[in-house]
């Protein structure tokens, strides 16, 4: 298990990012055969499988991909838009929307920062929990629970 070496305040974004990265790296060390996670559903509250939820393999690959961004930074904006949107139409519409918002003078940067910052904090904590759940479930499946 990877141990955190940096000391930041408990709710600092850097602490949350470090915790997430450490948990995903731990998950990668524990899960030796990721294909075992295919078609295995994550248990929800009460031990019941969540309907329409992705399987553990999907979570595993998503958590690893996000961790690469957390560890190494984001792709350049153009590459990211091409990868996610698949076309330039979405990127053009988004650029026009930002320009309209800036021109109208309604851009409250501080409020937007706090909204995105708190959302990022919440999402990273949720993803950290998912990495722990994938690791725990894999250990249960392979008899490695201790």
Swiss-Prot record:
Q: Where is this region: Disordered?
A: 83-104
Gene Ontology CC, one term: nucleoplasm
Describe the task this protein carries out. Answer: Plays a role in the regulation of lipogenesis, especially in lactating mammary gland. Important for the biosynthesis of triglycerides with medium-length fatty acid chains. May modulate lipogenesis by interacting with MID1IP1 and preventing its interaction with ACACA. May function as transcriptional coactivator. May modulate the transcription factor activity of THRB.
Q: What is this protein called?
A: Thyroid hormone-inducible hepatic protein
Q: Acidic residues bias located where?
A: 94-104
Keyword field contains Metal-binding? no
Which superkingdom heads the taxonomic lineage of this protein's source? Eukaryota
Family membership, please give it.
Answer: Belongs to the SPOT14 family.
Tell me the GO BP annotations in alphabetical order. lipid metabolic process; regulation of lipid biosynthetic process; regulation of triglyceride biosynthetic process; response to bacterium
Keyword terms, alphabetized = Cytoplasm, Lipid biosynthesis, Lipid metabolism, Nucleus, Transcription, Transcription regulation
* Disulfide links within the chain: none
Q: How does it assemble?
A: Homodimer. Heterodimer with MID1IP1. Interacts with THRB and PLAGL1.
What the entry lists under PANTHER family is as follows: SPOT14 FAMILY MEMBER (PTHR14315), THYROID HORMONE-INDUCIBLE HEPATIC PROTEIN (PTHR14315:SF18)
Q: Which GO terms describe its molecular function?
A: identical protein binding; molecular function inhibitor activity; protein homodimerization activity
Q: Which Pfam families match?
A: Spot_14 (PF07084)
Respond yes or no to whether keyword Lipid biosynthesis is given for this record: yes
* Coiled-coil ranges per UniProt: none
């Amino acid at each position: 298990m990877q141990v955190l070496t940096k000391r930041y305040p408990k709710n600092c974004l850097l602490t949350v990012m470090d915790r997430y990265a450490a948990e995903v790296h731990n998950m990668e060390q524990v899960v030796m055969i990721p294909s075992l996670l295919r078609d295995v559903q994550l248990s929800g509250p009460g031990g019941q499988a969540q309907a329409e939820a992705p399987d553990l393999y999907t979570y595993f690959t998503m958590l690893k991909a996000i961790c690469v961004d957390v560890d190494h930074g984001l792709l350049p904006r153009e590459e990211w838009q091409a990868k996610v949107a698949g076309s330039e139409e979405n990127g053009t519409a988004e650029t026009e929307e930002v320009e309209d918002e800036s021109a109208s003078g309604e851009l409250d940067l501080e409020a937007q920062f706090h909204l995105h910052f708190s959302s990022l904090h919440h999402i990273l904590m949720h993803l950290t929990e998912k990495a722990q759940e994938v690791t725990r479930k894999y250990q249960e499946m392979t008899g490695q629970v201790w």
